[in-house]
């Protein structure tokens, strides 16, 4: 049972479909993660984070353990944008790993998050992607909850004509929706299911927060939303967005039209714990390097012009010269600013070899109509069918298919060295990928 997907209009008249959150038969359920009670018989290979065992992309036991250690563990996770619950009574459904989540704003203006699972029989309480109501009611037996998740009423709690009903000692206060801790920062709602998670300020660290405030520190508005299914383990996408080495090799549009190249000034900045990262480049500093020709990079062998060159026109929103940036927050959040295309991405595991990737294209409330139009146009660079990002939807599945039969083999991740460390002089490195695996090993106990 579900509702029709919501439509988000774009300023150009184009309509992008918002993701339909109500799960179907293809989505795994939280019960499938319950088997993870202890680490599997698994040992990380020698070589530290410069060697990654292919088994982590295809082993159901490891996937199940991730639900417990990562998605229900002591980490902060992106849940939604604050603007999606901007009004009192607003309701937004999302996912934290395989666990369905509700985010609300109550009548006092406070933001809450809770598991989308009725305390009675475990049914989903909210079925729509977004809604606005004074309370939450489970369609199965009409148990009603406040926007803070507290149980308010139980249908026929006292029975009918004095017969039946709940026992005399039934206490509604003991049957609320399971709450998450919530913090709102830079227009985003973060949640955690663990009481041991440190404050969000500490989890992010100074470097991460500073760059988040650069790109996300103004009031935001949504220009478009869509999602896609990619047929690979979620960690392959987490690697991909941290991999500055591949960006101008696989994505020929970047190289051909000089949007983002390794022969531009730029760098990689890792957070203090190595888990989060920022990759950036400065388009105006391009000095065409011989290495592109020597490496026979296909897109560097010829010159091309766009029939619509206005696609790549930009205005300077910041005074630091950065024109392309990818920022990640471990484990699943990505923030991008490609030219003037601002977006948030996040992934939801849908199985050991299937992932749903969500894209939310953004502007600032202060944008002029011309700036908003440009952001919408440049939204064509990324997304499921983007001029740049299209290839990522395929390449990760190639890795999934290539590695599934070789669980004892490992990936070789030594571009730029063997350590996870910042490098603000070159992006010809896999340092941020190693940083992800550093965090993964820490939290998983591998």
Language model regions located:
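Rieske [2Fe-2S] iron-sulfur-binding domain
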Residues: 2, 84-195, 201-206
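N-terminal pre-ligand scaffold of iron-sulfur
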Residues: 2, 6-128, 181-184
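C-terminal catalytic domain of Rieske-type non-heme iron oxygenases
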Residues: 8-22, 105, 110, 180-446
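N-terminal short leaders/motifs
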Residues: 33-62, 130-144, 173-186, 277-312
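Residues at helix-coil transition
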Residues: 71-72, 120, 147, 242, ...
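Short Pro/Gly-enriched beta-strand edge/turn motifs at strand-loop
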Residues: 73-84, 161-166, 325-331
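Short, charge- and proline-biased low-complexity linear segments
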Residues: 78, 84-86, 156, 254-260
């Amino acid at each position: 049972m579900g509702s029709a997907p919501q439509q988000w209009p774009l300023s150009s008249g184009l309509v992008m479909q918002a993701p339909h959150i109500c799960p179907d038969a293809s989505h795994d359920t939280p019960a499938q993660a319950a088997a993870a009670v202890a680490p599997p018989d698994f040992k990380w290979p020698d070589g530290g984070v410069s060697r990654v065992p292919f088994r982590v992309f295809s082993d159901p036991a490891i996937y199940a353990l991730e639900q417990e250690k990562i998605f229900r563990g002591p980490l902060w996770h992106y849940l939604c944008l604050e603007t999606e619950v901007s009004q009192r009574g607003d309701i937004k459904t999302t996912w934290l790993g395989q666990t369905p989540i509700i985010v609300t704003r109550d009548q006092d203006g406070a933001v809450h998050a809770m598991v989308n699972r009725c305390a009675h029989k475990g049914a989903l309480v909210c079925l729509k992607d977004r809604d606005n109501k004074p309370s939450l009611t489970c369609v199965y037996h009409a148990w009603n909850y406040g926007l803070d998740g507290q149980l308010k009423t139980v249908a026929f709690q006292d029975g009918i004509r004095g017969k039946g009903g709940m026992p005399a000692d039934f206490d509604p206060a003991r049957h609320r929706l399971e709450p998450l801790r919530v913090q709102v920062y830079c227009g985003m709602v973060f949640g955690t299911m663990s009481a041991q998670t440190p404050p969000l300020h500490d989890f992010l660290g100074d470097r991460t927060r500073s760059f988040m405030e650069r790109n996300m520190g103004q009031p935001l508005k949504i220009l478009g939303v869509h999602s896609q299914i990619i047929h690979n383990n979620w960690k392959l996408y987490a690697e991909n967005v941290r991999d500055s080495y591949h960006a101008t090799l696989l994505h020929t549009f970047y190289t051909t039209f000089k949007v983002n190249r390794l022969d531009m000034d730029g760098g990689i900045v890792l957070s203090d714990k190595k888990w989060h990262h920022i990759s950036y480049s400065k388009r105006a500093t391009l000095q065409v390097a011989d290495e592109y020709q020597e490496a026979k990079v296909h897109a560097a062998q010829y010159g091309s012009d766009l029939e619509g060159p206005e696609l790549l026109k930009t205005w300077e929103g910041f005074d630091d010269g950065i024109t392309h940036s990818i920022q990640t927050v471990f484990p699943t959040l990505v923030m991008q600013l490609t030219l003037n295309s601002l977006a948030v991405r996040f992934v939801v595991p849908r199985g050991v070899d299937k992932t749903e990737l969500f894209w939310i294209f953004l502007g600032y409330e202060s944008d002029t109509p011309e700036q908003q139009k440009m952001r919408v146009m440049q939204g064509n660079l990324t997304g499921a069918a983007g001029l740049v990002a299209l290839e990522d939807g395929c390449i990760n599945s190639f890795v999934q298919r290539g590695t599934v039969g070789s669980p004892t083999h490992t990936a070789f991740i030594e571009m730029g060295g063997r350590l996870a460390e910042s490098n603000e002089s070159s992006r010809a490195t896999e340092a941020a990928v190693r940083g992800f695996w550093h965090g993964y090993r820490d939290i998983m106990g591998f």
